[in-house]
Amino acid sequence: MQKRKNKGRFGDEASQRQLRVSELIKRNIAKILIDSNFYDQDRKIYSASVTEVRCSADLKIATVYVLPLDNIDAQDLTAFLGKNKNAIRYALGKEVSLKYLPDLRFKEDTHFLNK
């Protein structure tokens, strides 16, 4: 019987630990974005859907893939989330207990746009 490999949608293999930490971060960042009100200087509300989180092999970097909601420009959203990543990371640190909290990087999820 062949052992099943954990492949992400980009083809590279991820360990079970990476998958568990990615799902934990995904659920908690989505909760943070729902519970918190993130505004820019013009009081524009940014809402996003977290579609996937990919952790590096050493779990020090987490790439968060987001889709904008409410007709928001995706580049504006990722720039805004990148600018506020320390506040999001701080809130994430209160929710999860990991030895090292990964650095967050936000990217637009284009996987659904290509289909």
Task: State each model region's role.
Residues 1-61, 67-115:
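Charge-rich, low-complexity N-terminal segments
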